[in-house]
Design a protein with these regions (language model features):
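Noncatalytic scaffold domains of N-terminal-nucleophile
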Residues: 28-49, 53, 61-62, 66-235, ...
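Bacterial N-terminal signal peptides that target proteins for export
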Residues: 1-10
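Residue-level micro-sites within transmembrane alpha helices that shape
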Residues: 3, 20-21, 62
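Ser/Thr/Pro/Gly-rich low-complexity linker/stalk segments immediately outside membranes or between
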Residues: 23-27
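Bacterial N-terminal signal peptides
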Residues: 9-22
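Internal alpha/beta scaffold segment
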Residues: 280-282, 287-335
């Protein structure tokens, strides 16, 4: 009977996991952590700990995923947040079914290519800072609906319960690490162009130092409000504030670069449509991999990479050679 390899987390890493299982063994250092009953992996140990605590308290994988994602919105706001979008790949053991939730951002209904042109010259505006540090590139967010859909289908916690640890983290604050400090430092000029962003990340006029405490009371307030009613985000006061910010970016007086408004309207928020999709299924050397389909390309390109690698006997190569073969293949697929 064919083995089944099921990935039930946010994101798609299954292809690489299976590939590594096929590579020759290499001496490994002792594990730094072991356990059973579940695992959580993120880029930040505080968010990871929140997910583990949810599991220890009896929550399931979906409860932990939402709580962890909300915490990442606090400690890793530059790449994760309630104002963005994403995907979920979920395996439900009860019915042996894999589903995917597509909560990616969507372009406003009136968006068009001309909006990215300089109104004075007609030339395409530079990507940074003009196009990405303005209202132009802001899509209609789907993260919150992704969380609520997953919890409603498979969770055991309410949205309020899942958001509670992140609310506490945002209110009490957290120690700034090197990654957070560098992100602010690298983007200082852009952050300083917007009053609210400046006040949050540059309260002293300079980037925070490692070890200082960062708080985000406005995010905590937002989490509290949507915990009571997610509709506030799409059809209530939060939605109106989002649209106002997109259409009238809160810049400082005389910002250092041109900041243009975006096209999002309250109708765009109201009309946002979440999609529950059939996953992409890939067979690889007796394993079955599931991942996100379009508009994500990860599973499709990953499947192409694995199809190519099936032509090589990786287990007959030493590990560095096998990894080089795999990396070269992935680079070609991603090009």
């Amino acid at each position: 009977m064919r083995n089944r390899f099921i990935l039930a987390t946010i994101g798609l890493c299954a292809a690489l996991l299976v590939l590594l299982n096929r590579l020759p063994a290499l001496a490994q250092p002792a594990s730094v952590a072991t356990g059973s009953g579940g695992a959580v992996a993120t880029v930040d140990d505080r968010a990871t700990r929140i997910g583990i605590d949810v599991l220890k308290a009896g929550g399931n994988a979906i409860d932990a995923a939402v709580a962890t994602a909300a915490a990442l919105g606090v400690v890793e706001p530059f790449s994760a947040g309630i104002g963005g979008g994403g995907f979920m790949v979920i395996y439900n053991k009860a019915d042996d079914q894999v589903i995917t939730i597509d909560g990616r951002e969507q372009a406003p209904a009136s968006a068009n290519v001309e909006m990215f042109n300089d109104p004075n010259t007609g030339e395409l505006l530079p990507m940074s800072p003009n196009r990405i540090s303005s209202g132009l590139a802001v899509g209609v967010p789907g993260t919150l609906l992704t969380w609520t859909e997953a919890l409603n289908r498979y969770g055991t916690l309410s949205l309020a319960q899942a958001l509670a640890p992140a609310i506490a983290l945002a209110e009490k604050g957290f120690s700034v690490d090197a990654t957070f400090a560098k992100q602010v430092q690298d983007n200082q000029a852009r952050f300083a162009a917007f009053k609210s962003t400046r006040d949050l990340y540059l309260p002293t006029g300079a980037p925070p130092i490692v070890g200082s405490i960062s708080k985000n009371p406005d995010l905590a307030k937002t989490y509290r409000l949507v915990a009571k009613s997610p509709n506030l985000f799409y059809r209530g006061e939060i939605g109106k504030a989002i649209v106002q910010t997109v259409q009238q970016p809160p810049t400082v007086e005389n910002p250092p670069f041109v900041v243009l408004p975006g096209a999002m309207t309250t109708a765009d928020l109201n009309d946002y449509d979440l999609h529950v999709r059939t996953p992409v299924a890939i067979d690889y050397r007796g394993y079955q991999l599931y991942g996100m389909g379009l508009p994500s390309s990860g599973s499709i390109t990953g499947g192409e990479a694995l199809e190519i690698l099936e032509g090589f006997e990786l287990d007959r190569l030493d590990r560095p050679q096998a990894l080089n073969k795999a990396n070269s293949n992935l680079k070609c697929i991603s090009a």
